[in-house]
Amino acid sequence: MCPVDSITETPETEAVKAAVADPDKIVIVSTSPSVRIALGEEFGLTDGSFVEGKMVAMLKKLGVDYVLDTNFAADMTILEEAGELVNRIAHGTKPLPQFTSCCPAWVKFAETYYPDLLPHLSTAKSPIGMQGPTVKTYFAKKLGLDPRRIVNVALTPCTAKKFEIRREEMDAAGKYWDIPGMRDMDQVITTREAAAWAREAGIDFASLADAPFDPLMGEASGAGVIFGNTGGVMEAALRTAYHEVTGKTAPSSFYDLEPVRGMEGIREAQVSLGDLSLKVAVIYGTEQVRRFLAEKKDQLQEYAFIEVMTCPGGCIGGGGQPKGTQVKGEKLLVSRIRGLYRRDAQLAKRNSYENQELQMLYRDFYGAPLSEKAERLLHTHYTDRSSLLGCDAGSYQVPREHTGKIRTGYEEVTKPGNKTRKWKCRICGYIYEGEQPPAECPLCHKDSSYFDEIKRWRCRICKYECEGVEPPAECPVCHKDSSYFDEIKRWRCRICGYECEGVNPPAECPVCHKDSSYFDAE
């Protein structure tokens, strides 16, 4: 699945830098909404700072040729997805509920563990999935660019986008031009990667003057902006769906849709589109998805539209974002969420269908949402991957019970609970959970000797925590090297059996009051 809050990403910056240095290449960077609300954290700016202009200026200073706004494609995704939703409701073209499809980790999770849901997933590509082929077709035509020279780069908060752009079917532009091997999007770099590149180049981010996006695919509505928040895709789509159903602008309540906003893992609402009443849900986190689907198994048909994101808070909490959440927790995510909602509220155009550059795109190229050309370039299909499990996917659909956490004056420990460990195959990267590694990897079929235990690590300086076979080469928060990391172990009191986790055992057992010498590492 998505390496949510991953220790580090597989870097692609060197490939992008090489393209920038190549005079035969035209480097186009498209920036996701959540990047501009978190990038400033990497340079010491206030949490939730909206740094869109500085972000564009930074990329221009790094030498890229064009900087475009993926919010433009978010508006495009809304038009396609809302149109598909209305068709499902009005004409029964596909089953309800319709699930969102813009989160690549959720898509792969559904393909692997819930293949029966695939007909319910919107076929609309994610904003990055739509931006790629549109740049290499429409944008290239308008500006007279050779699409073979274009290096399409997505700047995202998400590490799973690196997988998404390499899905076999993400080659619509190549098929359009009949150029085998051409990919829609060529590289993905995360917020952290971009910040590291800027630091390496000696850029003083805070002093940069704001710069605008390049024209043609740089306009976006407030609906595109809030795509980065959990509940944002739902709110944006409902604004357009209301217009599609009634022919009128949505009422004011649709521009601050409280029932779908917030940090609760599962939120539900009843929404009226004129005379049409829809039951909707917003979910983030795969464990919450399991819980929702298990609890609503017999009532799922009552819902019309369900948004799913895997990261906490949505894309603003993506695995490629600055790691401040390790220290500041949910408070930082809320700052980012509020920053995007503030930006939405500031814009004159808050509906995707009001985007004039997007109107021009449909008039001059796609024709209309869900047109034959739009279906070819902007929509996709999904693959049943459940065979990778080597067993019935149903056995993975039972929600796990979480163990709670206690905070003591000494350090954080967990209540006694599941002793399951995580193991990683050195060959294919498959992750297995169990007390011991599996006898055989279900993907590459190597035996248990090829598995390493995934451990937990804590930085002694800033208390950042992460998981990995080895500690990270550098702490993403305080930038100390791996020697500053200690393994977090499970400890058990020999007298009373009390269990806890920490770098060291507690000074005193809270149950039998024996000192730390009575604790053994398990």
Show where each model-derived region lies:
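Iron-sulfur cluster-binding cysteine motifs and their immediate structural context
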Residues: 1-13, 438-449, 472, 476-483, ...
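Residues immediately within or flanking Cys/His clusters that coordinate Zn2+
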Residues: 96, 155, 305-308, 422, ...
